[in-house]
């Protein structure tokens, strides 16, 4: 768990990128393999820019999704009040062990995906690149093949969590924004026109919706 990852120095970010990419780290010339499963969950504060280091594109691409955490609703905030200010000590409870998680990951990869869903993934990701067919010069740089891989895994996992035997195009549309938005940047003209990445993704989704 990397808290406020954009406050880490570029050298630290580079070391993390090696771990995410190669599943091992190197210390004093010695290689140390990381345990399996290995996951990186990271947070960053989008409101404070002073003292931060923007993550490079290569590192952003290593994250499966980017999820914005909004303010909690009233009921959730009420639970937070009572659960964090009482005298009872709250302890984290394990929901699964490593073996179960690895088995679940394997099951996700075995879930069948229909041709229509595959084509929707390819069409959406390829449309999010600069100078894509029908593009209107909004995108400065866009998602690579890893975005297609991530979207394929994400829709499979969502279907499995919902108790379905295969993902649907609705899964592709619902997960497009969190999978793609950190893998894209807009042109200066698009930003000057007030466009945002979520706006552009919503526009791209209409082509396959």
Model-derived regions: residue spans:
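Short alpha-helical scaffolding segments that buttress acidic/His motifs in well-ordered protein cores
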Residues: 80-81, 121, 175-180
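Canonical AAA+ ATPase core
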Residues: 7-8, 12-15, 20-98, 102-111, ...
